[in-house]
Each structure stands twice: as C-alpha cells, then as structure tokens.
C-alpha cells in the first residue's frame, strides 16, 4: 500500500494544486493574467453573457472577488459589460475581440503548463485522470 492509498482526497488534491498552480501562474504572468482572470476568460469563452454573480457561483468565489477580476479584465479591454440593463437584470459580461485572442493565448500556455505537470503520467493515465477529475467536479 502506497502513501496515496491512505491519504485523504483533499490532501492529495492540495498537493497536486501546489505543483500545478505555480506552473500555471508562471505561464500566465507574461500575458499579464492571474489564474482567476484566466478562469473568468475561459468561462466567458464557453458561456458568453454570464453575469458577475453567475461567474462567481461557477468559480466558487465571492461576488466581490469576481467583480474585482471583471473590473481588471474590463480595464484591460478584454471584457465588456453594458453600462446598464433593464430593471432587475444583471450586467452580462462578454469577451471583446482582444479578450477572445487573450483567452486563446492563455489557453495554450495553460495547456503547456498542464503538460509539464502531467508528464509523469502516460498518455492513457493523463486521459483517465482528467476524466475522473471531470466526473468528480461535475454538478
């Protein structure tokens, strides 16, 4: 029995995150992005028009934290939100052309960082690992 057989899942995921997070952060830094900003760009590329509150729920962060991320991306010209909407509606966020290009570049550097971390596994192990993570993380 290996050490992993006896370790709690949260501990193992924390350790994987501790290896992956600095790799991804270093890859995103030259693009002027943080990991939360990349997550926001990725969510908006997959689901345009989400509000700040919806993005916060999907990212499991506070609405205040997501609003900070959105404001920075807006200031960078990557995200656009209307100045106002009809009564009772939240502001939908969308990627600008610059945001779509940035999201595409960010996706590429994040995948390269992923590949460096996953290099310890065979290709079939990588696919299975990602499949299992997707299953555990689905709603």
Swiss-Prot record:
User: Which positions fall inside the HTH marR-type domain?
Assistant: 6-138
Quote the PROSITE patterns the UniProt record gives.
Answer: HTH_MARR_1, HTH_MARR_2
Q: Per the UniProt entry, what are the Gene Ontology biological process annotations, in alphabetical order?
A: regulation of DNA-templated transcription; response to stress
Altering residue 42 to A: what's the impact?
A: Attenuates the ability to bind salicylate
Q: Which UniProt keywords apply?
A: DNA-binding, Repressor, Transcription, Transcription regulation
* UniProt binding sites for salicylate: 42, 114
Biological role stated in the UniProt entry: Represses expression of the HQNO methyltransferase htm gene (Rv0560c) by binding to its promoter region. Also represses the expression of at least five other genes, including the methyltransferase Rv0558. Binds salicylate (SA), para-aminosalicylic acid (PAS) and gemfibrozil.
Give the protein's recorded name. HTH-type transcriptional repressor Rv2887
**Species for this entry:** Mycobacterium tuberculosis (strain ATCC 25618 / H37Rv)
